[in-house]
Design a protein with these regions (language model features):
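Active-site microenvironment for binding and transforming phosphate-containing groups
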Residues: 147
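Extended, Lys/Arg-enriched charged tracts that mediate electrostatic binding to polyanionic substrates
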Residues: 9-46
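Histidine/acidic-rich helix-loop-helix segments that form or flank divalent-metal centers
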Residues: 24-29, 144, 177-211, 216-231
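Negatively charged sequence features
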Residues: 22-28, 34-35, 69, 73-87, ...
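Extended active-site and interfacial segments that coordinate phosphate-rich ligands
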Residues: 37-40, 51-85, 221-226, 230
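Single conserved hydrophobic/aromatic residue that forms the stacking wall/gate
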Residues: 1-11
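Alpha-helical phosphate/pyrophosphate-handling elements in metalloenzyme active cores
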Residues: 42-44, 49-51, 55-63, 71, ...
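Active-site-adjacent bridging/hinge elements
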Residues: 51-53, 92-104, 182-185, 212-219
Length: 231
């Protein structure tokens, strides 16, 4: 846990309240929290409605009588968020449909082709499942077509944990239907026992398609999945 790591890393604990420029709040909250928690071991803060703020906490091993520790950490986070902001502004404008062809250059797994190959399989599986769920096949196939394109983005390269999530943001920003955006966001769910499952039918169709393709594919090449997580 971040709490135990942050407090355990210092002997004489001093908690300092810092802040960053409010303009960075336009960046998706997942990027902000990951930058603060995973990269810097900072503690983000939230208002009474659960909305992230521009203030964060750090744990220091000495008193900051001159305010230099506070200033130094604020400079560090602003530099990191400036990079994230640059990637966000660049990536969100990249046409997702045109990015599909780039998946031909990204291997999914040896023996299972590229991510482009996987996307074609997901389109077929998703179409079959959409017929069973009596939902729009067009939406499911569109979701499947662009669901892996965020893997080519700078942001997912920097924050691999955000694959799918960033794709959902990109799709929403580019005007795709909200069902399509949510399906992309939730395609990997559930990740483990402590995460929720997709509830919307389009999200269910894409998530199940992705897992079926992975399971059948790995058994097909005699690579039996062994994990505590869903494939």
């Amino acid at each position: 846990l971040l709490e135990s790591r942050g407090l355990g890393d210092v002997y004489k604990r001093q908690v300092l309240l810092c802040s960053f420029n409010k303009r960075f709040l336009s960046i998706p909250k997942e990027i902000l929290t990951l930058t603060m928690q995973s990269h810097q071991k900072y503690f983000p803060t939230f208002d009474n409605n659960g909305v992230i703020t521009n203030e964060f906490l750090i744990v220091s091993n000495k008193k900051d009588q001159k305010g230099l520790i506070k200033i130094g950490n604020e400079r560090v986070i602003e530099a990191r968020l400036s990079d994230a902001e640059f990637f966000w502004n660049k990536d969100k404008t990249q046409n997702l449909v045109k990015k599909i062809s780039e998946l031909k250059l990204m291997n999914f797994f040896k023996g299972l082709g590229t991510y482009f190959d996987k996307v074609q399989r997901l389109r077929k599986l998703g179409g079959i499942i959409s017929d069973e769920l009596l939902i729009s096949k067009e939406k499911v196939e569109l979701s499947a077509s662009i669901c892996k394109t965020d893997l080519t983005s700078n942001l997912v390269g920097e924050f691999p944990e955000l694959q799918g999530i960033m794709g959902g943001y990109f799709a929403l920003h580019q005007g795709f239907d909200r069902d399509v955006s949510l399906a992309i966001t939730e395609q990997y769910l559930p990740i483990g026992l402590d995460t929720h499952t997709p509830k919307k039918p389009f999200s269910v169709a894409l998530s199940v398609s992705d897992k079926i393709d992975t399971l059948v594919g790995f058994f097909g090449i005699n690579e039996k999945p062994t994990s505590s997580k869903d494939p």
